[in-house]
A protein has these predicted regions:
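Gly/Ser/Thr-rich phosphate-binding loop
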Residues: 137-192
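Conserved ATP-binding loop and adjacent catalytic segment of the adenylate-forming AMP-binding
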Residues: 170-210, 216-222
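Conserved pre-ATP/AMP-binding loop-to-beta segment of ANL
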Residues: 18-36, 70
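Conserved S/T- and glycine-rich ATP-binding loop of Class I adenylate-forming
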Residues: 37-40, 73, 88, 124, ...
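Short beta-strand->loop structural element characteristic of the AMP-binding/adenylate-forming
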Residues: 1-14, 45-48, 97-104
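Glycine-rich helix-loop-beta junction characteristic of Rossmann-like nucleotide cofactor-binding loops
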Residues: 63-68, 115, 140-143
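Conserved AMP-binding A3 loop
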Residues: 32-59, 66
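AMP-binding/adenylate-forming
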Residues: 51-56, 72-133
Length: 225
């Protein structure tokens, strides 16, 4: 939010506790952070997320969206979940500015969040509910014009919402991925493209049972079924 910190202790008094605890975990000596599976293949369970994998995923996304040290990223999702964690890691990897706001159904509401005023945002991520609620307010809807790229994930994007997104200047992308693949591995441009496309060297195939196989060479596991 326009501030520079040289150590975690400086951040303790300014940052949300949840964010501080994640950064404390990120900069500790372990090679992983704790997360929870998406629940798409069974009951959610605690897993270890490789920091190396998270960095690789962040670099892949940053390369696609041309994120660098001059960029501004918006964090409006909980860092308890992979989407929030990864936005922080993308900012760290790029040396970009991270604009943090209170997690709510109205992330573009300026009241109490004056750091938003006239800020250009290069990349943001929201769940469909946040986008839908923001579109109901004319002032919040106008603020989408300040966001260059918006990733929408965590739940399906309805046809009605997709149609509304075609009327704003923001380049909007639906995401495909899960905690196990360390955030998204494919995107669909909602304003135009009808199909998902894989990022980087990610590839998809089916096994003899018809199950989806994800080949992700940038991750240590490389293959997910």
């Amino acid at each position: 939010n326009g501030r520079v910190y040289t150590c975690l202790e400086q951040l303790r008094e300014q940052a949300d506790e949840e964010l501080f605890l994640f950064l404390e975990e990120w900069f500790d000596d372990r090679s992983y952070v704790l997360g929870h599976t998406s629940g798409s293949t069974g009951a959610p369970k605690e897993i270890q997320l490789s920091k190396a994998d998270m960095r690789a995923s962040a670099r892949m996304t940053n390369a696609f969206f041309a994120i660098d040290r001059e960029s501004v990223l918006l964090l409006c999702l909980s860092v308890s979940y992979i989407a929030g964690k990864m936005m922080v890691v993308r900012a760290l990897e790029a040396g970009a500015e991270l604009l943090t706001v209170k997690v709510s159904s109205h992330p573009l509401r300026i009241t109490g969040q004056e750091e938003y005023v006239d800020r250009r945002i290069d990349l943001a991520a929201m769940v469909p509910m946040q986008v839908e609620e923001s579109m109901k307010s004319e002032s919040e809807k106008q603020r989408f014009g300040y966001i260059r790229h918006l990733m929408i994930g965590g739940a399906p994007v309805s046809v009605a919402l997709e149609e509304r997104l075609k009327k704003i200047p923001t380049q909007c992308y639906a995401t495909y991925g899960m905690t196990e693949t360390v955030s998204h591995i494919a995107l669909k441009k909602l304003n135009s493209d009808p199909a998902y496309f894989a990022l980087g060297e990610v590839g998809f195939e089916q096994d003899e049972r018809g199950c989806l196989i994800i080949n992700a060479p940038h991750l240590q596991a490389r293959r997910f079924v």
